[in-house]
From Swiss-Prot:
CDD domains: KU_like. It comes from Geotalea uraniireducens (strain Rf4) (Geobacter uraniireducens). With LigD forms a non-homologous end joining (NHEJ) DNA repair enzyme, which repairs dsDNA breaks with reduced fidelity. Binds linear dsDNA with 5'- and 3'- overhangs but not closed circular dsDNA nor ssDNA. Recruits and stimulates the ligase activity of LigD. InterPro entries: Ku70/Ku80_beta-barrel_dom (IPR006164), Prok_Ku (IPR009187), SPOC-like_C_dom_sf (IPR016194). This is Non-homologous end joining protein Ku 2.
Amino acid sequence: MAGGTIWKGYIHFADTDVAVKLHAAVKAERIQFHLLHKRDHVKLHQQMICAYEKIPVPTEAQTKGFEVEEGKYIIVDPDELEQTAPESSRMIEVHEFVKTGQIDPIFLDRVYYLEPDLHSEGYSELVGALQEMGAEGICTWTMRNRSYLGALQASGKILRLNTLRYADEVISVKSLELQESPVSEKELKIGSDLINQLTTPFQPQKFENEHEKKLQKLIEKKARGEKIALLRPRLLKPTASDKLLQALEESLKKVA
């Protein structure tokens, strides 16, 4: 079930405006721990402490600064920051279209659902057109005093809005030091056969957050007063290059 409406606006392209409501498409339900005083288990609160005077600094006495060198800052006042804020808008501006699948996944960030608002005209037509053309709309919009870049996508009968990272936020693979190692035809064949044996339609419901489940069980045991046995983590070692072929063959036998 989609979350509550977090933004309302219009999709604008050419001379068309489609009224929509924005909903979160994913939820981040994680077990959260509070920081407590170890002595009496009372919840702790954070304070902003002056590094020089060692005393708490109230909010009204705080300001923001950009460090240009160690210990030297350019002070930026709230009014000055306000001037850089994007102009408030209720428009998702579609600038161009690209073929579906053309966007490298490294640029994909958070995904939202777009629901038609006020029996919006043109919504179904836009969904159908994107599917017919196999296209996604590259768009920009403003939300919560931030500017966003995104991809407008059709999925079934709905529209999705996937925020995109800007190009300067993505680290180039050229920064990595990659060492090429020779691969024999036999290793390549066995590796390909192994992948083929394990290939299946994606079923996300098959996979669960094992760490989250273990945390939940730990909390339940502690709540019942059970003693927790401490286990040492199992250390894994990478497969030696001279044993890679043997390991691949054994893996292939297990799934065959």
